[in-house]
Amino acid sequence: MILNTGARTDTVQYYTEWLLRRFAEGYVLSRNPLFPNKITRYELTPDKVDCVIFCSKNYAPILPRLHKITDRFHTYFYYTITAYGRDVEPGVPSIEDSIQTLRKLSEIVGRQRIAWRYDPILLTEKYTVSYHLETFARMAKALAPYIDRCIFSFVEMYKKVEVNMPEIILLSKTDKKALAQGLGLIGDKYGIYIQTCGTNGDYTRYGIHPSGCTMLDILGRANDIVFKTRKHKGMRQGCHCIENRDIGAYDTCPNGCKYCYANKNLCKAMENFKNHDPASPLLLGYVRPGDTIVQGVQKSFR
């Protein structure tokens, strides 16, 4: 089983105490977002979890105690650092601070376990194609020695994104081509393996690799382990990732990113964050009368 700690929320930045407690106690409960009365229990032990993957925009809160997880589990880290400022990502540290934190993370876990996510790419009057490429080049130069690869995607124009960011300029085919070509050239210059995420077109002619973000070969090489050959079913349409289980909850991230796919309502997310109990086995709330707890299937890929 591959355990995902951060697809639904930034668990690392805002729920570090809870996350560490879950690993210390050896289990976690996850409420089904589609069927709220159904809760799944997962055992957090090395014999049940093949690899723990992290997704965050700020690893600083967990760095001093990250060894409590990495000493016991195979791991892989996705670190999102974009070109945007607080006008788009109000709760995210500056680019400079993020680069420094990634370097520290790399020193702890090794560059082979870190993927830099530069996504989603979106355009506004401020964040133009040239702005992205200039910023990406500066970041790539600084990050190249500390990462395994870089993953990018173009923004998905969900209805809530259109509502929250009316200033977004729709990406044309020409824009995407210019961005992909530019990213490919920069990646080649600094020796960075660059790949797409999801259904973002074919840009192999620019040195961009089409792949899933969470592939068994990526996790295996990073941790020097061999996984069985498995079909990667993906987590959604167009996704090429290996199936994994997320232990977070939607509408719980206070970052306030305007393009956020996971939050429907920032006010609700802030309220949920305020009411969070680090001692609960659930990230959000408690087991309620009428809830059904089932043991999750934790089949090994090894």
Task: Locate predicted features.
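Conserved Radical SAM active-site core
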Residues: 1-88, 95, 100-106, 111, ...
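Conserved C-terminal portion of the radical SAM core fold
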Residues: 97-163, 181-198
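Auxiliary alpha/beta "docking" domains used to position bulky ligands
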Residues: 58-59, 164-167, 193
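Surface-exposed cleft-lining segments at the edges of enzyme active sites
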Residues: 84-92, 120-130, 164-171
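A C-terminal junction/extension of Radical SAM enzymes
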Residues: 174-240
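Local cysteine-cluster metal-coordination motifs and their immediate loop/turn environment
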Residues: 237, 243-265
